[in-house]
Curated annotation (Swiss-Prot):
Its EC number is 5.4.3.8. This is Glutamate-1-semialdehyde 2,1-aminomutase 1. GO terms for molecular function: glutamate-1-semialdehyde 2,1-aminomutase activity; pyridoxal phosphate binding; transaminase activity. It comes from Bacillus cereus (strain AH820). It comes from the Bacteria. Gene3D superfamilies: Aspartate Aminotransferase, domain 1, Type I PLP-dependent aspartate aminotransferase-like (Major domain). The gene is hemL1. HAMAP family: HemL_aminotrans_3 (MF_00375). Belongs to the class-III pyridoxal-phosphate-dependent aminotransferase family. HemL subfamily.
Amino acid sequence: MVVKFTKSEALHKEALEHIVGGVNSPSRSFKAVGGGAPIAMERGKGAYFWDVDGNKYIDYLAAYGPIITGHAHPHITKAITTAAENGVLYGTPTALEVKFAKMLKEAMPALDKVRFVNSGTEAVMTTIRVARAYTGRTKIMKFAGCYHGHSDLVLVAAGSGPSTLGTPDSAGVPQSIAQEVITVPFNNVETLKEALDKWGHEVAAILVEPIVGNFGIVEPKPGFLEKVNELVHEAGALVIYDEVITAFRFMYGGAQDLLGVTPDLTALGKVIGGGLPIGAYGGKKEIMEQVAPLGPAYQAGTMAGNPASMASGIACLEVLQQEGLYEKLDELGAMLEKGILEQAAKHNIDITLNRLKGALTVYFTTNTIEDYDAAQDTDGEMFGNFFKLMLQEGVNLAPSKYEAWFLTTEHTKEDIEYTIEAVGRAFAALADNK
């Protein structure tokens, strides 16, 4: 099968004349998979995409995670339509934002108080500000390879040592800002302890993806998150969970419910918007009371809590409350994992597959992936070839070796069976070109 992308290629050529790099987020380009024009989608329904050339795909991108209920879910679409008919932006309080805040609190008991913002980046950025206001300290800690949005303070790399002050990961981020960030490897208690022994008295908070989603799906080792809480609290700092990817993705109550570990502050996004722009943050009452108008930590937003996003988020959570959906995602995920591993063995392709319920990552390596260094040391060229072969098979993945495959509640066993067959054909082609 040879799929043509003529219209996507023409559209990308035109986009390059008007939009920086031809895309509105760099992760949408095909730079990480060998280049070429990214595929422009025209519509989505359920588990499927159709591009501007009319090609149909089974979608495992899910907009990098938010689309857990599938594209154009009727309950969510109706809620958005009703909100639009009533006016999408007021600049005033609404009943919808109160209802949605109550739903989030009921789902995640660690949220005594909630504030809505417009993106995951904004949610994380503000939790850092609140933690600094509460503790009176300035430094933060993060784990290498964990992405927490594109604000200056979190765009840092690990530096040259195992536990270092940060170095900028983007042009335009001053070294002085990066020096406020301490980066340590994920799943390594000893290095975390060493860093806290050295800098703990200056640390306001540690940012934690409780289940990593940004160098693939990587779970914490048993007891790791509990030890993080213990060591960080001993240092007088706060624990911030970045659940922008994980909240409502693996379990209704988020990773903190699934893993049984409670943070001081939580940042949310992606799934909670039902596909519309959103972010939220919340936590313990005494910490959240640092936020204006109650406290000195200022945060505001013209679009924050807009009725359309609130309505979409409420509708999404109502869908996810239906019995058996998370069990279905886990069942389909297990089926997909088993099939991919069988195809890899059949065609002698070396892979490591990390899966948690309805999300997984295929790494082209034989190594165990438990931290960022291991994820980096995988075959990006082979992934790029695999990605393009899967496009030809009508299977849409994220164009990066670090990203996850996300299942939706609309995927079927037939979709999984076809995907496994497509993986087999792609692996056969890779084996022929070794």
